């Protein structure tokens, strides 16, 4: 038989519950609020694969520096750091003061590859302060901070850089490039290919590197007569020079041909196009001054004629000659070049003419290298090395 609840009966039950609640002691509160004991293992959400992790209990913080008490010898830490790449080394340096001081040692920063990176000017100067010797900044973008940092003050510390590749780098302000060059007075190799405008002040800073051997200025702009004279008058130990497609004026071309250092072994003077100053007389000056030349690139110098080949043949050490697209030279004159290892004449003769040259100039190799490698930082299979100096970590 169903039981029927009346309104009076319901009010009686509510009153009874209130009396029970009021009779509850504080100890009962703590018992009721206590959560049931759970297993120290719990299941983590995820796919069908069951994974169980141990619950991590909170630990009281401690101010003890277990690694800073000398438990690990410093010599051991130096050995460990020598196996780390730059990214892991920076992570290690952020853990404690001791590791930060160890990670700043110059032996871990002898080379660095920042290819294609976006980096601030202050960060770059901080990296240079770690006594980097080989630095690759190819295709990097160097920005200026909105709020100028410490480097706005005069930078007095000279850099230890010996090899610097800034090809195709983008600078938010030309003064950034000038600040970098002002710190570099011990360079052995420098590349400013496609870096935009190179003014007279930058040329003066480049000229301070008297031990410069590799200099790549291909496709740079705004060279003045004063700037090029400053560089060539001071850097007399140059072995490889690339000034191809630099849009030099006629006066600058004449001065360059007169002031080239006799120590040159590889020279690229291509891309003058129809400049009348790049003629047979200036080729004669180059051959008379730079008698140790082993490779010469005169591509796209359309004013020179076959008469310049008489002077080129006097270079006893010449092994590679490139005169691609030099349309002013009579192709029959090519047959007089008998002592070359490589002869590049792209665009000068037909395919049948190439076959004739290969048969008549044997064992000279014809049209082997369409692109010049003179003073170029990365050449061949070493895509991350610059001038045969490694810039990449082992992993």
PLM feature segments, named:
Residues 85-88, 188-191, 347:
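Flexible interhelical turns and helix-capping residues at alpha-helix boundaries
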Residues 64-68, 74-77, 94-100, 104-108, 118-126, 128-134, 155-163, 182-189, ...:
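Leucine-rich repeat
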Residues 114-116, 137-141, 166-170, 192-196, ...:
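Concave beta-strand-loop units of leucine-rich repeat
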Residues 184, 188-285:
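Solenoidal tandem-repeat scaffolds enriched in leucines and small polar residues
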Residues 155-186, 260, 272-273, 379-383:
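Long hydrophobic alpha-helices with heptad-repeat/coiled-coil character
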Residues 1-155, 161-162, 178, 203:
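N-terminal adaptor-interaction module of cullin-RING ubiquitin ligase components
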Residues 1-54, 63, 76, 251-395:
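C-terminal capping region of solenoid repeat domains
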């Amino acid at each position: 038989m169903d039981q029927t609840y009346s309104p009076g009966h319901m009010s009686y039950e509510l009153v009874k519950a209130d009396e029970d609640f009021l009779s509850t002691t504080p100890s009962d509160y703590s018992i009721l609020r206590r959560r049931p004991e759970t297993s120290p293992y719990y299941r983590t959400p995820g796919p069908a694969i069951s994974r169980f992790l141990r619950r991590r209990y909170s630990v009281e913080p401690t101010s003890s520096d277990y690694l800073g008490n000398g438990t690990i010898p410093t010599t051991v830490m130096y050995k460990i750091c020598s196996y780390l790449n730059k990214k892991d080394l920076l992570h290690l340096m952020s853990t404690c003061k001791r590791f930060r001081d160890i990670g700043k040692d110059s032996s871990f920063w002898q080379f660095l590859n920042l290819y294609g990176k976006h980096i601030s000017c202050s960060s770059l100067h901080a990296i240079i302060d770690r006594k980097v010797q080989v630095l690759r900044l190819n295709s990097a973008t160097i920005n200026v901070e909105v709020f100028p940092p410490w480097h706005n003050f005069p930078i007095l510390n000279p850099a230890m850089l010996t090899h610097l590749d800034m090809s195709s780098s983008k600078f938010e302000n030309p003064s950034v490039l000038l600040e970098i060059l002002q710190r570099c007075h011990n360079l052995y190799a420098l590349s400013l290919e496609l870096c935009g405008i190179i003014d007279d002040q930058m040329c003066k800073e480049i000229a301070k590197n008297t031990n410069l051997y590799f200099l790549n200025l291909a496709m740079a702009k705004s060279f003045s007569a004063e700037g090029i004279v400053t560089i060539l008058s001071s850097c007399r130990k140059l072995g490889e020079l690339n000034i191809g497609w630099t849009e030099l004026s006629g006066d600058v071309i004449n001065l360059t041909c007169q002031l080239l250092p006799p120590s040159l072994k590889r020279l690229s003077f291509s891309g003058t196009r129809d400049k009348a100053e790049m003629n047979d007389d200036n080729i004669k000056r180059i051959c008379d001054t730079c008698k140790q030349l082993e490779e010469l690139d005169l591509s796209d110098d359309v004013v020179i004629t076959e008469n310049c080949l008489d002077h080129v043949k006097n270079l006893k050490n010449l092994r590679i000659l490139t005169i691609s697209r030099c349309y002013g030279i009579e192709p029959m004159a090519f047959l007089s070049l008998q002592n070359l290892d490589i002869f590049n004449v792209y665009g000068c003769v037909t395919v049948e003419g190439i076959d004739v040259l290969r048969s008549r100039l044997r064992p000279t190799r014809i049209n082997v290298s369409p692109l010049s490698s003179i003073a170029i930082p990365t050449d061949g299979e070493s895509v991350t090395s610059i001038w045969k100096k490694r810039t990449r970590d082992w992993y």
